[in-house]
Amino acid sequence: MSASSGNKAIIAALGANLGIAATKLIAWAFSGSSSMLAEGVHSLADSGNQLLLLLGGRKSRKDADTEHPFGYGRERYVYAFVVSIILFSIGGVFSLYEGVQKLQDPHPLEVPWLPILVLLVAMALESFSLRTAIKESNHTRGGETWVQFIRHAKAPELPVVLLEDVAALSGLVLAFLGVGLTIVTGDPIWDAIGTICIGVLLVLVAIVLGVETKSLLVGEGARPADTATIQRAILNGPETQRIIHMKTLYLGPDELLVAAKLAFDAELRFSDVAASIDVIEERVRAAMPSARAIYLEPDVFHDPSQHGPLTDTIIIRGRE
């Protein structure tokens, strides 16, 4: 996923959430609806989250240095994980607290039509934001389902914005039901129940975000299809006999580390092995452009059935 496509979705969501937060909080001030307060805080939290995603994207573009020789690509994962914490604490826990408080001490809505009007406007704005996120995601989603895309995406911005927008629209529907039932029945308990449901929804979304971004922070390797592509690129030539073992790791959304131990003929000159490794690296980069850091170690392979060591300890030296 390009950074520009993620930024488009983030900026669209940020603009929508700032406007929505203001209208929701105004509606809460005039009506006293706890659902409006919960949704207002939710939108403020989302706005802060989008600013964090933009900040993470900017920091990730810093050049590598001696302290971080592989660069700062994982900054995007760090800020995405912080987003899940904010959504859980500020959005979810606050909504649950406010809902329980309103449940224990319910108050009638003072201007019941205002929350309904605000919710309808908010639904329109959130739909625009979600539409933008879906449009940008479709550029990179390929044939994956939405669940697969969210689980497998290495760039966190679009999955985060998608989940936030879906949660926002779902929260608006819950708030609409809570306020609507309060107006119809005259019982403010429904407003409190709607607020609690919003809190539960936000906590669940935050947990999903936290689990997925934690996996990226710990370190994920290439997908099986990408791993197979790299292996084919390595073996698609006469240079090496086989791959003894290979490991991959995403250093950032667009930067993949490839480390492999390759079997070479023990009789080869060192200069020939070095030239072969250069050729293999070029093939890997052509097949997998995200493979920015490639480390290939030459070795001599022994068949395990021959009861010898898996790899030879002979150092391959050049011969004149």
Q: PLM features: residue spans?
A:
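Topogenic membrane-insertion module of multi-pass membrane proteins
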Residues: 1-22
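Acidic (Asp/Glu-rich) catalytic motifs at the cytosolic membrane interface
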Residues: 16, 29-59, 96, 100, ...
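Hydrophobic alpha-helical membrane-embedded segments
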Residues: 18-26, 31, 43, 47-53, ...
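Aspartate-rich (DDxxD/NDxxD/DxxxD) Mg2+/diphosphate-binding motifs
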Residues: 56-75, 105
